């Protein structure tokens, strides 16, 4: 663990703030006249899921926590637990959905046998890193109305994990599409 100046904090940085692990969700830097600079942070507590806003002076320092990223294969879901396998040791372990603060919105992106990066701190999983874009198969799509293309027309499509996203009218059942894992929006059709 080391200290980091508030001006060097970036989105996605892991910090030990008030004795608890946090991840930086948003960061805004403001330069004041003679008053120096300030950094506004939106932090998510990785233990109790609370989101707090903090303002730090430019010269302030906070403790950055060292995390370990472990490549793991997602195997299956069992009630409130996600079962993973460590790709180095081949040990299976479970991750409780209630113990990780920001995992609920990522579960729909998990696909069996997919490789994901689990972030560990103090020998405990605190985050799950998804790739920027994830490929899905479309299992249900609304019927497109011909001629309804005056604007950027979109329709709802259901993906094989149950996730529903808006996609262009030309997307049909059986197509594979890429979805942005951060915005949960259609990115592009997979070219085969």
Swiss-Prot record:
Intracellular or extracellular location(s): Cytoplasm
An annotated GO cellular component: cytoplasm
Protein name, entry field: Elongation factor P
Q: Hey, which pathway is this one from?
A: Protein biosynthesis; polypeptide chain elongation
Gene Ontology molecular function: any one = translation elongation factor activity
The protein's matches in SUPFAM superfamilies, at most eight in alphabetical order, are given as: Nucleic acid-binding proteins (SSF50249), Translation proteins SH3-like domain (SSF50104)
Origin superkingdom: Bacteria
Q: Which GO terms describe its biological process?
A: peptide biosynthetic process
Which family does the entry's similarity section mention?
A: Belongs to the elongation factor P family.
One Pfam family recorded for the sequence = EFP
Q: What does this protein do?
A: Involved in peptide bond synthesis. Stimulates efficient translation and peptide-bond synthesis on native or reconstituted 70S ribosomes in vitro. Probably functions indirectly by altering the affinity of the ribosome for aminoacyl-tRNA, thus increasing their reactivity as acceptors for peptidyl transferase.
Please provide the record's keywords in A-Z order.
Answer: Cytoplasm, Elongation factor, Protein biosynthesis
The species is: Borrelia turicatae (strain 91E135)
Keyword flag Cytoplasm? yes
Q: Which Gene3D superfamilies match?
A: 2.30.30.30, Nucleic acid-binding proteins (2.40.50.140)
What coarse category fits the chief subcellular location reported for this protein? cytoplasm
Check the record and name the NCBIfam families matching this protein.
Answer: efp (TIGR00038), PRK00529.1 (NF001810)
